Amino acid sequence: MEWETVIGLEVHAQLATKSKIFSGASTAYGAAPNSQACAIDLGLPGVLPVLNREAVRMAVKFGLAIGAEISPRSVFARKNYFYPDLPKGYQISQYELPVVGLGKLEIELEDGETKVIGITRAHLEEDAGKSLHEDFHGMSGIDLNRAGTPLLEIVSEPDMRSAKEAVAYLKKLHALVRYLEICDGNMQEGSFRCDANVSVRRKGTEKFGTRAEIKNINSFRFVERAINYEVERQIDILEGGGAVVQETRLYDPDKGETRSMRSKEEANDYRYFPDPDLLPLEIDASFIEGVRGTLPELPDEKKHRFMTHYGLSAYDAGVLTASREMGDYYEAVVKACGGHAKLAANWVMGELSAALNKDNREITESPVSAAALGQMLERIEDNTISGKIAKDVFEAMWNGEGSADAVIEKKGLKQITDTGAIEAIIDKVMADNPGQLEQYRSGKDKLFGFFVGQVMKATGGKANPGQVNDLLKKKLQ
């Protein structure tokens, strides 16, 4: 029997505001526990919430970027449930009237095709605090610094049919919120986290299967593993004659499996009702147009421009526009190296990315600036150094040994381009290797590489490879 996987994702993006959604308390990460929780966050009597305008602006910005309808009137509701890190006994969220309506996001599949994933809604809500179970023996501690931090919950349609599609959607969404500068996307710190709703059904049927919700998955790799495990688990149950239970599950990355957390609640379990302390949110057209004017060039637009303007392949353009910072760095390199777009792409995706990954740095933390890398690429183009020597120059620059010109001068790496000097070295190599010379002239063409290698070795890699090839061809005839 063939089964079809059905996946919908709920993503919580922590908005990059300086203060909380309903109070003036700071949202800075890493402060001492409970040092950033004010009377409103603590749920003390007699205090009233005041909506953060910047959080609304960021939500509208996201809605415009996904081509969604912005609700002129939305309502905040109380979502009632008990949890130790929820001081009020309810969470302020949105239910029937969210700020952002239907939208969509286009993802690329592995075969190069594209697929549109529907976005049902995006609504504003406050985050809860944090329960700390490992720091206290036999007890749990509560840190309310995170309570009241603004979240944008982005709910997709159940349009994904594999774990890989879900990861592609999640990565696209992650890049988008970072491009918009509404969320820093830091998954380790919980700024961007995902709940996956997973079910299976017989292929060809319209009715959805019973879904399980996997909570708070905080890496792309874990999302793929958690979904794949859950799909196999549900298929095993159904093929064994059992029934899948609707429940909330947690993914255990150490064991690579999901485990039951609690039975899945329905909306009526939360007893939603409009928050009497908050007026309905009215958004007029002028506010929306003002936000529209702040939209940056979006990832798909930038990718298309890189392909048409710089002549890059779809793959290269996709890699270079994966983050706003990467795209900006690349364009600065192209400008600094005189417009050699393909050479710049190769170096940014190659040596630079490898060095960043090795040192676990973001591109904004690169010790080699875009201008400095561009200057080095110019030295390749004007034949001052070869591409091979450039790798040594780049390593020295990365280690703080100065600019490309300074490193080339200090280490004596300038390429030998004097024809007479190269010819003299070729003559010596030929004289030192009479056996190989005779074999080459007898038709053993593969030995050409041997002679190139000997010349490059004799010059310490500093001879111009193109000149060496041309001169050797003439000399070896």
UniProtKB/Swiss-Prot annotation:
GO BP terms, alphabetized: glutaminyl-tRNAGln biosynthesis via transamidation; translation
Chemical reaction(s) catalysed: L-glutamyl-tRNA(Gln) + L-glutamine + ATP + H2O = L-glutaminyl-tRNA(Gln) + L-glutamate + ADP + phosphate + H(+); L-aspartyl-tRNA(Asn) + L-glutamine + ATP + H2O = L-asparaginyl-tRNA(Asn) + L-glutamate + ADP + phosphate + 2 H(+)
Domain of life: Bacteria
Function according to Swiss-Prot or TrEMBL: Allows the formation of correctly charged Asn-tRNA(Asn) or Gln-tRNA(Gln) through the transamidation of misacylated Asp-tRNA(Asn) or Glu-tRNA(Gln) in organisms which lack either or both of asparaginyl-tRNA or glutaminyl-tRNA synthetases. The reaction takes place in the presence of glutamine and ATP through an activated phospho-Asp-tRNA(Asn) or phospho-Glu-tRNA(Gln).
Source organism: Thioalkalivibrio sulfidiphilus (strain HL-EbGR7)
Family recorded in the similarity comment: Belongs to the GatB/GatE family. GatB subfamily.
Protein's recorded name: Aspartyl/glutamyl-tRNA(Asn/Gln) amidotransferase subunit B
Annotated HAMAP family: GatB (MF_00121)
